[in-house]
Every structure is written in C-alpha cells, then in structure tokens.
C-alpha cells in the first residue's frame, strides 16, 4: 500500500463496514482519493451529520432525528398492533410491503449468549413495558385496558432470531398478551431485509 498514514487510516475505517475486507476497503479508498474527492468529502460530511443528529426513538427504539419517530407519531397507524423486529433495516423491509399499518419495536439486535448479548442489551424490558404497561401499583394493566392487543414477532428466521422470538413470546404470553409469529413462508435462516416483499407480505397475512 502507498506510504501514507492517512490512507491506511481511511482503509481501516472502511473495513468497519459489513462485508468489506482489506482488498475492498483499499479499492474504495483509492477510488475516492484518485477519482472522486468531492464525493469523499460529501460522504464524510453526511456521515458526521448522521452520527451527530440521529438518535433512538423514545417509543420504538428505531433510528430517527426526532424524539419520537414519524411512524410512532402518525395517528393513522393501528396502535393495537406492535411488530417486533431486529433492526431498522427489517422495519424498512416490512414498511415496503405496504401490508402492515401497526407500530414497531426495534430490538437493535438479537439474543446471542456466545457473543455476550443478553436481554438487557436488546431492550427486552422496554419492550415488555411498552406492550404491557403497569398501573400505579406496579401491576400489569388488564388486557382490555392496554393499547397494544397483539405483538407480532418478526425477528429473523435464524437460530438467534428464533431463540429471541421464543423468549419474548414466553414472557409476553405469561402477561396475557396475544403473540403471533410471521408465517413460515420466510425461508429458514434468512434475514428479512433480503427477502422479497411478496413473501414478507404473505408471512404477515398468514401469521399465527
């Protein structure tokens, strides 16, 4: 590689992107510096702005520039349904189907004991409190008094996603919540953001 600490630093930074190895990162770095310096500066400014301005929605945990995201703030959404997904990308995939008009809760991950990711790391207690709020005495509200009437589990059909869905389902069912899971039309081992929209729409419609 060229003798440049700055170039090495850029290459190492690009390697932090998912699926980008050393060779791909080097190609990107050389391309930007050789052929598109204005584009490189645009990327740098956009990235800095996004990091500084984007936060987690106070209600659903997705990424937003506001305290409450556009979806949660929309009075036209069906507030009786809460769809649980792993990532904002999964949420976006479901939105593109136009088959779901409820609200979301974004875990920002999945349970993975081998990687040290437990319930607290993906905000399960926040999810439980959102789905089944407590009264002034600390007791769960009766089902008829809750805003959320159904929790739809749309975690990915991977081993970790299935385990996460199982833990959530057990906890919420014990609190008297109706819990459904996307139908098995979504291939085992797949991630929602890579599944075609028709398949996702059918999985939503046929959930059980």
Swiss-Prot record:
Arranged from A to Z, the UniProt key words for this protein are: DNA damage, DNA recombination, DNA repair, Metal-binding, Zinc, Zinc-finger
Organism expressing this protein natively: Polaromonas naphthalenivorans (strain CJ2)
> What CDD domains would the database entry show?
TOPRIM_recR
Toprim domain location, by residue?
80-187
Which is an annotated Pfam family here? Toprim_4
A GO molecular function held by the record: zinc ion binding
Summarize the protein's role.
Answer: May play a role in DNA repair. It seems to be involved in an RecBC-independent recombinational process of DNA repair. It may act with RecF and RecO.
Q: Which GO terms describe its biological process?
A: DNA recombination; DNA repair
Task: List the lineage, top down.
Answer: Bacteria, Pseudomonadati, Pseudomonadota, Betaproteobacteria, Burkholderiales
Record-given protein name: Recombination protein RecR
Zinc finger feature spans (C4-type): 57-72
> What NCBIfam families has UniProt attached to this entry?
recR
Q: Which family does it belong to?
A: Belongs to the RecR family.
């Amino acid at each position: 590689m060229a003798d440049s600490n700055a170039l090495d630093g850029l290459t190492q930074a690009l390697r932090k992107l998912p699926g980008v190895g050393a060779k791909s990162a080097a190609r990107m770095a050389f391309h930007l510096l050789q052929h598109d310096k204005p584009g490189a500066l645009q990327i740098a400014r956009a990235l800095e702005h996004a990091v500084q301005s984007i936060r987690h929605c106070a209600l659903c945990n997705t990424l937003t520039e506001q305290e409450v995201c556009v979806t949660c703030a929309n009075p036209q959404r069906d507030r009786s349904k809460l769809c649980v997904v792993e990532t904002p990308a999964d949420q976006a995939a479901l939105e593109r189907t136009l088959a779901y008009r409820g609200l979301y809760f974004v875990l920002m991950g999945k349970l993975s004991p081998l990687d040290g990711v437990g319930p607290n790391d993906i905000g399960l207690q926040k999810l439980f409190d959102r789905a089944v709020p407590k009264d002034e005495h600390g007791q769960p509200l009766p089902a008829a008094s809750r805003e959320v009437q159904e929790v739809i589990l749309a975690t990915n059909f991977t081993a970790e996603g299935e385990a996460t869905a199982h833990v959530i389902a057990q906890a919420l069912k014990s609190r008297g919540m109706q819990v459904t899971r996307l139908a098995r039309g979504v291939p085992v081992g797949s991630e929602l953001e890579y599944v075609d929209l028709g398949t996702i729409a059918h999985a939503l419609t046929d959930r059980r």
